[in-house]
């Protein structure tokens, strides 16, 4: 089975050099994951897309990888042919493939064309649609509400007939935007924040401040591993656990309860900054959202941030709890 990988739109508006770098990064990421899973790493990259070919018996495995890899906007499952680049030759090949699919149904043809041809995309649509309407057992053409939508892409003499269009994860290729260290607790907010940083192309390491014993640490490690395994395993990352029970005990004896939340988070950022320096990481990620709890007012967040010279990213900062 062959796939055409459409890139995230924000990649497509970059300059040629940046676009090339990101496309190459995405191809390398896919090759690593495919190889790790025992799939042939048949990935070709172009400036505006990727093409992937996998054995038919590994389609489900391949699609699971493609749909969970940052940087991919759409995955097109296609049948691909070399054709004479004429209207008649294209129409005849399309008829061979789609005639059974449109029998007894209304249809529409949508085409994209790239390369040197003596016709444009609209002319290609009209010609193929007319040929199918005359020769297939369809009930007719319906431009607005068809039962079957036939999608074609013609690039020079390569014809791709789209079987399915699948929604990808979006974002930037992992590793293309640097690395961050995410403060994780095992809760929903920090998990979502970590996912969003990965989807944005940030290689995401994990740091956990243990306040509740071994069982809690194991649970957080499992959540972090799940995130990495599903969305980020093209890159190796670190999971760092820091025992913080003693710190909490000291705080309980030295400060009032009203300052506890802010002070604890300041100390966590100070410790995380040291780890980030060792990893060569430029920013920290947290799952905080403005005003969700008392320690997350703007004033308190500013006090917390003052404890570190690192940039602190908060992907959930303006999101409501139901959105998260």
Residue positions per predicted region:
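RNA-binding accessory domains that recognize and position tRNA/RNA substrates
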Residues: 1-181, 191-237, 306
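A glycine-rich phosphate-binding loop feature that marks nucleotide/adenosyl-phosphate handling sites
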Residues: 48, 241-244, 289
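A short acidic, often aromatic-flanked loop/helix-cap motif at beta-alpha or helix-coil junctions
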Residues: 81-86, 149, 246-249, 320-323
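Structural beta-sheet core signal
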Residues: 182, 206-208, 241, 286, ...
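Cofactor-binding loop segments of dinucleotide-utilizing enzymes, especially the Rossmann-like FAD-
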Residues: 185, 209-211, 244
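S-adenosyl-L-methionine
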Residues: 229-256
């Amino acid at each position: 089975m062959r796939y055409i990988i459409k890139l995230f739109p924000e990649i497509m508006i970059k300059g040629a050099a940046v676009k090339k770098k990101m496309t190459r990064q995405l191809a390398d990421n896919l090759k690593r994951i495919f190889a790790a899973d025992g799939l042939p790493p048949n990935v070709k990259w172009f400036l505006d897309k990727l093409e992937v070919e996998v054995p038919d018996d590994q389609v489900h495995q391949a699609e699971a990888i493609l749909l969970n890899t940052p940087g991919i906007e759409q995955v097109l499952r296609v049948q691909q042919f070399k054709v004479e680049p004429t209207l008649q030759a294209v129409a005849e090949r399309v008829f061979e493939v789609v005639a059974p699919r449109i029998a007894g149904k209304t249809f529409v043809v949508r085409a994209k064309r790239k390369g040197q041809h003596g016709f444009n995309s609209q002319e290609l649509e009209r010609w193929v649609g007319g040929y199918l309407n005359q020769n297939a057992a369809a009930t007719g053409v319906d431009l607005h509400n068809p039962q079957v939508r036939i999608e074609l892409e013609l690039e020079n003499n390569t014809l791709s007939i789209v079987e399915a269009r699948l929604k990808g994860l979006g974002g930037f290729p992992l590793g293309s935007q640097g690395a961050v260290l995410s403060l994780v607790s095992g809760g929903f907010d920090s998990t979502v924040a970590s996912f969003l940083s990965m989807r944005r192309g940030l290689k995401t390491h994990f740091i956990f401040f243990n306040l509740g014993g071994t069982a809690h640490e194991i649970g957080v490690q499992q959540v972090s591993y799940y995130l990495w395994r599903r969305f980020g395993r093209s890159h190796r990352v670190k999971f760092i656990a820091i025992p913080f029970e003693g710190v909490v005990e000291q705080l309980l004896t030295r400060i009032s309860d009203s300052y506890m939340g802010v002070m604890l988070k300041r100390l966590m950022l100070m410790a995380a900054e040291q780890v980030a320096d060792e990893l060569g990481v430029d920013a920290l990620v947290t799952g905080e959202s403005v005003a969700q709890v008392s320690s997350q007012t703007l004033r308190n967040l500013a006090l917390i941030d003052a404890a570190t010279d690192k940039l602190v990213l908060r992907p959930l900062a303006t999101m409501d709890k139901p959105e998260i």
